[in-house]
Amino acid sequence: MAKTIMIQGTMSNAGKSLLAAGLCRVLKQDGYRVAPFKSQNMALNSFITKDGGEMGRAQVVQAEAAGIEPDVRMNPILLKPTTDVGSQVIVNGRVQGNLPAMEYYRRKRDLIPAVMEAYESLAREYDIIVIEGAGSPAEINLQENDIVNMGLARMVDAPVLLVGDIDRGGVFAQLYGTVALQSEEDRRRIKGVVVNKFRGDRAILEPGLKTLEELCGVPVAGVVPYLHVDIDDEDSLSERFGRDKEPRLIDIAAIRLPRISNFTDFSPFERYENVSLRYVERARDLRAPDMIVIPGTKSTIADLQWLRQSGLEASIQKAASGGTLVFGVCGGYQMLGRHISDPEQVEAAGVTEIDGMGLLPLETVFQGEKVQTQTNGVFSGVAGLFSELNGKRYAGYEIHMGRSEEARGALFSMGNVYGSYVHGIFDEQEVADTILKALCTKKGVSFESLGTFDARAYKERQYDLLADAVRAGLDMPLIYRILNQEV
């Protein structure tokens, strides 16, 4: 069976996901077969595996860092919020239904066999399992039925690294308070604490680190710097949306829907030096972009209503009539159509039908069975400015409850309006390059001036940079002693 180490945090966004990815990469570089694991993840940003299972993207990133194929066993329970008090529950990659938060809380221990089966299966195949917790183990109101933090650590007998975020302040209180709120048994599981997202001279921290070790009774296992790496992890979501980029040579405006999902669909455009990708949630901020993109959403009808009430729908329609390129993905694609109906209340929005934006001749009906599959092929029948896509390969995945009449092929177009059900459709560098070349031609600027790069080599380099920082920041001899149960 595999050795294991678990990364828990003092709070959400402490940097657990990225640190786990970095540790996966370090261990891979050191010659180990390593796999990530998170028993329960709550996220709208999901991925479809080769066998059609749905899992959280954080574990996909960690699997990529480890150099292995993403597998739903790495994230056996995925919760996708549908309302403020309920989620769609996905177990082993398949939808089980929608549950209110309290009902799920009462029933989640019934899922322990699924969690353990997934973990034990991975542990038989790999040398090391890097486990990520969720939120904080100090949420004492949730400890009784916990299956993702100390509850899971007990089930799989995992040693724990506790991570605190110094960038938001109060890291010593975070770490000491979290340790203090654990039972004696669980405190013994904490083998080291990590100060994460540090900026500055470590020497300034040393007196505090020494006192922290004395108070907690465990060693400081590392001080990891604030990382400037370009990796699609969930902890970067608020930072990504918070950027107020000024328009560059090519300006792309992405609509920041309230229930946005798979925001990483547009990440490829961010990596060109002279392309700006702005997330917009107010009509006055739309300005005059070269392309408007409408992302996927967990609640198409509710977000279409928001788009209408905010004035953004009218602004998008006006821009489209003036020749601006508009591109919708999944839920955004459905919104661009004429009509959406939900007779079975799949989205539980309290609305059975709604008119769409009327920019594509599309009729969408939501059904109970979810489409979830990887897809790839060659573009054909693409008209208009992006016609150069024809003959080029694409790869991605579909996750949606709705079926749309008139939807043909991977990309449906009418004039300057385009739509697709395929998440990740821009990930192939040739696809992103072709779209940007077309936008450059329309604008009369040189594509070469955008700054080009090798996307695959770039991604691998980012994982290596992450590993370099994690290796330098962590006490790796201590980490290996923890893995070998010598601490």
Residue ranges and their predicted role:
Residues 1-320, 325, 342-345, 368-369, ...:
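Flexible phosphate-sensing "switch/lid" loops adjacent to ATP/NTP-binding sites
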Residues 333-334, 426:
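Short active-site segment of divalent metal-dependent hydrolases/proteases
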Residues 330:
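Catalytic nucleophile serine of serine hydrolases
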Residues 337-391:
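A conserved active-site-flanking secondary-structure segment within enzyme catalytic domains
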